[in-house]
């Protein structure tokens, strides 16, 4: 299994920087049992002048808030505050080319009722290009994108990614690099963790919103 931290790695957990090895969460959390949490996947890059820059942090953290409010999770953090915390987290861990994962998660709740609070963790780890630079062999998945009438697909919610995990696992088990998911009408929708773009005659085409999670770079 991949290792994302060591004995010295720091994460930001509910207002404090703590060592990842010392971090704890409630095992009765509604997030753990029902996938009721929202998150972002943000990249940072080491620039030619040696500084570290986060890619579109405002857009990512604004979407984190939108995802939380869309699925009725309490949210009280400010985007500017979270960007500052993330910059500090990268510096403390001496990270440049990194993947940043903020997660808003629920307290203990073994029912389906609304919570009166949410918690926040921000983690970061060194990361190479997501799928590398080689051409990929992709396979149309037997799993469809979910019905947009059954879920708020514009929310980047954890539970929704079981669909992505199954599609990706299926493709790799059959010898492919990644999956391509179709919508309910059989149209191309997206990959398990990325939007799809096609270049034709000098123009870019991408599936419309509806059955997809509209990406920040889309």
Language-model segments: residues:
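Helix-start/capping segments and mature chain N-termini
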Residues: 1-88, 111-218
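Short secondary-structure junctions
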Residues: 91-98
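Short, internal active-site loops enriched in acidic
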Residues: 105-110
């Amino acid at each position: 299994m991949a290792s994302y931290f060591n004995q010295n790695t720091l994460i930001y957990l509910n207002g404090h920087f703590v060592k990842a090895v010392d971090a704890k969460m409630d095992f009765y959390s509604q997030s753990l049992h029902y996938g009721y949490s929202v998150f972002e996947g943000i990249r940072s890059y080491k620039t030619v002048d040696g500084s570290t820059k986060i890619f579109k942090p405002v857009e990512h953290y604004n979407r984190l808030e939108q995802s939380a409010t869309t699925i009725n999770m309490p949210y009280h953090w400010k985007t500017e505050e979270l960007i500052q915390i993330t910059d500090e987290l990268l510096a403390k861990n001496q990270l440049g080319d990194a993947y940043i994962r903020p997660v808003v998660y629920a307290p203990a709740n073994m029912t389906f009722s609304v919570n009166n609070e949410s918690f926040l963790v921000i983690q970061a780890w060194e990361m190479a290009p997501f799928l590398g630079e080689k051409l990929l062999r992709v396979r149309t998945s037997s799993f469809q994108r979910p019905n947009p009438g059954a879920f708020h697909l514009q929310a980047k919610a954890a539970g929704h990614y079981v669909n992505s995990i199954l599609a990706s696992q299926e493709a790799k088990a059959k010898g492919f690099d990644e999956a391509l998911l179709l919508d309910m009408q059989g149209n191309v929708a997206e990959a398990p963790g990325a939007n799809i773009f096609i270049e034709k005659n000098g123009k870019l085409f991408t599936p419309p919103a509806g059955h997809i999670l509209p990406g920040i770079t889309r």
